[in-house]
C-alpha cells in the first residue's frame, strides 16, 4: 500500500534506511531496450550520500545489483528487480528519536498511523527510499532518449533566499554537475555553497527550489480530467521527501497576468508540430503535452532533522526537547536534483506507453 507508482510503466520500491537494503521492481519496461547499467549507476552516484562537504557524511557506495529482467544487455519485458545494499548504518545515533518525535518529521504521523515505526534512520520516510526511484528513472530516461530524443535536466534554482536565473532552453547537465550544489550559475553556486555551510555549522538546515525542463517531449502525453500530465507530474515530484510546492510554466506568477498576456500564441511550423510564441503553459495544455518544453519547479522544505535544540514531545505525550544526532543533509536540494529528474522520466515513460496503447493502432 502506497509504495507503487505508475500504470503501465510501474515501479514498486522497498526497504528502509537502516535495513539490509533498498530497491525497486519495475514492471512494463518494453522488451529489447538496450540497457546501459553504467548509466543507471551514474544516476545513483549523483544521488548518493557523502559526495561533498554540503551533504550528509554517511558513506555508501550505493552499488546497484540488477537481479532480473535483463539478459545480454537487453530488457526482456519481464519485471526488472534492482537492489542496493545498505553498508553504513549507525543505529546508535538515533537513540534520542526512539523516545522523542522530531518536529516536522514523519516520526509522529507514522506512529499515529501504524502504532509502530522504524525510527532508526527514518525507515520509509528516509531519502534512501528514493534509490529505487532513481534506478528505475534511469531506465525510463534511456527509453525516452531512444524513442524520442527526450532530454530531462533539473538544477537548483534557489537555496534559502539566493536565486539563480538560468535559461531553461540552453542549460546542460554538464553545467549543472560542474559544482557540488548543482546550480549552473557558477557565481550564484559559490554563494549557495557558502550559505549551506554556514547554516549547517549553526546546527540548522535550509530549503529551496529545483527547476526542471523536458526538451523534445513526445506530443500527446496525458489524458483529460483526472490523468492530466501536469497532475501526474505534480503527484510524482510531491511524493519525494521534503517537497512542499509545485509549479508548472508561469506558475503562481501567471496570476499577475491578463489572458491576453498569458496566452501562448500558436505559430506556423514546417514540420507540422505545434509551436508557440511563448511558453506560459509550460508545455502542457488541457493536460496534454504540446511538444514545447515542459518546465516545472519544485519547492523543498528545510531538512527536518537538525542539531539545534527544539521543543517536542516524547512517545508518552510529555513535553521534552530534542537536539538530533546522526548524519543528515543541511540541505537536501543538491542530491534531490536526480530524484526530480527520475520522477519526471518515470511519468513520461508511463504516459508514453499509455499513449501508444490507446492512440497508435491506426
From Swiss-Prot:
Stated EC number for the protein is 4.2.3.5
Q: Which GO-annotated molecular functions does the record name? A: chorismate synthase activity; FMN binding
UniProt keyword list: Amino-acid biosynthesis, Aromatic amino acid biosynthesis, FAD, Flavoprotein, FMN, Lyase, NADP
What Gene3D superfamilies does its record include? Chorismate synthase AroC
Top-level lineage group = Bacteria
The UniProt note on the cofactor reads as follows:
Reduced FMN (FMNH(2)).
Pathway per its UniProt entry is: Metabolic intermediate biosynthesis; chorismate biosynthesis; chorismate from D-erythrose 4-phosphate and phosphoenolpyruvate: step 7/7
Which reaction does this chain catalyze? 5-O-(1-carboxyvinyl)-3-phosphoshikimate = chorismate + phosphate
Its BP terms in the Gene Ontology are: amino acid biosynthetic process; aromatic amino acid family biosynthetic process; chorismate biosynthetic process
User: Per the entry, which co-factors are needed?
Assistant: FMNH2
Q: Which residues bind FMN?
A: 124-126, 286, 301-305, 327
SUPFAM superfamilies cross-referenced by the UniProt entry: Chorismate synthase, AroC
For this protein, the record's CDD domains field holds:
Chorismate_synthase
Which residues hold NADP(+)?
A: 47
Output the Gene Ontology cellular-component terms.
cytosol
Query: PROSITE patterns from the entry?
Result: CHORISMATE_SYNTHASE_1, CHORISMATE_SYNTHASE_2, CHORISMATE_SYNTHASE_3
- UniProt family annotation: Belongs to the chorismate synthase family.
Quaternary structure (record) = Homotetramer.
Role noted for this protein: This reaction introduces a second double bond into the aromatic ring system.
Q: What is this protein called?
A: Chorismate synthase
Amino acid at each position: 500500500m502506497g509504495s507503487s507508482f505508475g500504470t503501465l510503466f510501474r515501479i514498486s520500491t522497498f526497504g528502509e534506511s537502516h535495513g539490509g537494503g533498498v530497491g525497486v521492481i519495475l514492471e512494463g519496461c518494453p522488451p529489447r531496450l538496450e540497457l546501459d547499467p553504467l548509466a543507471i549507476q551514474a544516476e545513483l552516484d549523483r544521488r548518493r550520500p557523502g559526495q561533498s562537504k554540503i551533504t550528509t557524511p554517511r558513506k555508501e557506495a550505493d552499488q546497484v545489483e540488477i537481479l532480473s529482467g535483463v539478459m545480454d544487455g537487453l530488457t526482456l519485458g519481464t519485471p526488472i528487480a534492482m537492489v542496493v545494499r545498505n553498508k553504513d548504518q549507525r543505529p546508535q545515533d538515533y537513540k534520542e528519536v526512539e523516545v522523542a518525535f522530531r518536529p516536522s518529521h514523519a516520526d509522529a504521523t507514522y506512529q499515529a498511523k501504524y502504532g509502530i515505526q522504524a525510527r532508526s534512520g527514518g525507515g520509509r520516510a528516509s531519502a534512501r527510499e528514493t534509490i529505487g526511484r532513481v534506478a528505475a528513472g534511469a531506465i525510463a530516461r534511456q527509453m525516452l532518449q531512444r524513442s524520442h530524443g527526450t532530454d530531462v535536466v533539473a538544477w537548483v534554482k534557489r537555496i534559502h533566499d539566493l536565486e539563480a536565473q538560468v535559461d531553461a532552453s540552453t542549460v546542460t547537465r554538464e553545467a549543472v554537475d560542474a559544482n557540488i550544489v548543482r546550480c549552473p550559475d557558477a557565481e550564484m553556486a559559490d554563494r549557495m555553497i557558502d550559505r549551506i555551510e554556514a547554516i549547517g555549522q549553526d546546527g540548522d538546515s535550509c530549503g529551496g527550489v529545483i527547476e526542471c525542463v523536458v526538451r523534445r517531449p513526445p506530443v500527446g502525453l496525458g489524458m483529460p480530467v483526472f490523468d492530466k500530465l501536469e497532475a501526474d507530474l505534480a503527484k510524482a515530484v510531491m511524493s519525494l521527501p521534503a517537497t512542499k510546492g509545485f509549479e508548472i510554466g508561469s506558475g503562481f506568477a501567471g496570476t499577475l497576468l491578463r489572458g491576453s498576456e498569458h496566452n501562448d500564441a500558436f505559430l506556423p511550423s514546417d514540420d507540422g508540430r505545434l509551436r508557440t510564441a511563448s511558453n506560459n503553459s509550460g508545455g502542457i495544455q488541457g493536460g496534454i503535452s504540446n511538444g514545447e518544453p515542459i518546465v516545472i519547479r519544485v519547492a523543498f522544505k528545510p531538512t527536518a532533522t537538525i542539531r539545534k535544540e527544539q521543543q517536542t514531545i516524547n512517545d508518552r505525550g510529555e513535553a521534552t526537547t530534542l537536539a538530533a544526532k546522526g548524519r543528515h543533509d543541511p540541505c537536501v536540494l543538491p542530491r534531490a536534483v536526480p530524484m526530480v529528474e527520475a520522477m519526471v522520466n518515470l511519468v513520461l515513460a508511463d504516459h508514453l506507453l499509455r499513449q501508444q496503447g490507446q492512440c497508435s493502432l491506426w
